[in-house]
Curated annotation (Swiss-Prot):
Disulfide bonds: none annotated. Pathway: Purine metabolism; IMP biosynthesis via de novo pathway; 5-amino-1-(5-phospho-D-ribosyl)imidazole-4-carboxamide from 5-amino-1-(5-phospho-D-ribosyl)imidazole-4-carboxylate: step 1/2. Its EC number is 6.3.2.6. NCBIfam families: purC. This is Phosphoribosylaminoimidazole-succinocarboxamide synthase. Belongs to the SAICAR synthetase family. GO terms for biological process: 'de novo' IMP biosynthetic process; cobalamin biosynthetic process. Keywords: ATP-binding, Ligase, Nucleotide-binding, Purine biosynthesis. It catalyses: 5-amino-1-(5-phospho-D-ribosyl)imidazole-4-carboxylate + L-aspartate + ATP = (2S)-2-[5-amino-1-(5-phospho-beta-D-ribosyl)imidazole-4-carboxamido]succinate + ADP + phosphate + 2 H(+). GO terms for molecular function: ATP binding; phosphoribosylaminoimidazolesuccinocarboxamide synthase activity.
Amino acid sequence: MERGRLVYEGKAKSLYEHPEDENLLVMEFRDDITAFNMEKMDTVEGKGVYNCLISARLFEVLEDAGIPTHYVELADERRMVVERLDMFNLEVICRNMATGSLVERLPFEEGEKLDPPIVEFDYKSDEYGDPMVNMDHIRALGLATEEEVERMRELTLQVNEVLSEFLKDCDIILVDFKLEFGVNPDGEVVVGDEISPDTCRFWDAETEESLDKDIFRKDEGDVLAGYREAAERILRGDEEKLAMLPG
């Protein structure tokens, strides 16, 4: 597929105009990997392919469950076609187990199960370090309406339920994950961005070893091996996507 003008370049993805439809974009997954707000950076050859294929599969799972996303179709192993969204400047985090920043700022035990899950909203800003915000902050900054925030929370919990069950069959624990949302051309709040080892904590169900970006954050070994293991499990039964995996 041809791609048009570069619209946006993020830490690990690039968005291009769609060659035929102004309401669509082509999202390309690069091999860049970052952590700690760009304090740690590297390039891992093939990582973008794993993230693209995993995201495509998980978006398809959500769409099959009736959860609206920006996903339209897979273009190739690195690119997908998505709806053009008016994005909220927010990140929504859903936590099923206590780990990461949660245990650093609150008295939870590492690995503690959270039932019901905890949902947090962060202001998406490298300058301010993505601080957690509540409805008062969101309202004062004009980031979203109360109805939009409630819809994002509702969708996040639905995503959690659907993906937790799907990943259980892949012998993966969905520890926590980050979502981004936007409004599509029809005025609907939908899940955007990606759902991948870059934005989720995936733990092996038996060993609780990381199959995600924590391998890079914590220097725990071969990042690509973890992403590949996650991809092979998540894409099980999807021969078309499995055939696109590197190597």
